């Protein structure tokens, strides 16, 4: 699996990511060609130059906005612009995910609905080029997984459209909270992490921590715009994962309930899954004074904790929720489709170290085919397993 590691020892910004990707070999001509899909010709110019930061070489990408008063584009306009473009589906998906995180942070900072967010500091033209360009570069490098180092908090003050703001600026803090990003001080008093850089890391990184075992292929160095007491360089490590299954951070919410209608508990579980929880389950327990109750457990992405927690408080009688973060190890997974006498059925395939360790027919497909042909579900399931085994043996059935 191709992995990209964001080394943010000196910080991260959109232009630094772009510079590092170009330093990794992303052709500038290809990048410009892909960015044309946004229809921003005449609104910006992209310049690239080799520079030094504290004596270390790096590539600096400079996005110059040509309009002195560029329009403030609302989130919905940016969403439509990217979704309706000719960009590759994977580039669109990553770009929209980054902008959505950015919009969520801005909405929380300014206390406005998500759909009314307008991008000013972060946005519009330069943010589009930085974010979409970074996603184009990751796609060109065929990166499947992103991991990031902790982020430096920086310090001091910056001038913005809203006046002087303390570093880190509010949008960056919101993004860090969203992604449960580990932070530290490297002693430098400057803006080291921009909202665009934080959004790229929070949206794209599956985990934050040390670099995993890699067979290193390339290291790209993207320069920041200023000289600092330390090399103002973002390093991008590209390599193949070695020997370890991917790990990711999950949030676990738990609460005990002994005074709620069981029908409401069933409804709560369904709705939590609809809100984005990965798994929801209950266990029977005995509580104080011998009362029977249930332990409700929710496993969800860290960014879904606020919504899941609010829903539990609103719909149940609990007075408190425990939450923790855990690491989980996951196998590489893919979906393959087989032909059976009852139609097509998806097979969920799990791999470890490049070898298949498990393959199971998708149960929903089996149910649908069984209902269509009026046969037992087990009959369809066995037919799908047989078709999969034939494929493994080289028979294209």
From Swiss-Prot:
Gene Ontology MF term list: lyase activity; nickel cation binding
Keyword Phosphoprotein: no
Family per similarity comment: Belongs to the LarC family.
Protein name: Putative nickel insertion protein
Matching Gene3D superfamilies: mk0293 like domain, Transcriptional regulatory protein pf0864 domain like
Zinc listed as a keyword: no
Lineage: Bacteria, Bacillati, Cyanobacteriota, Cyanophyceae, Synechococcales
Keywords: Nickel
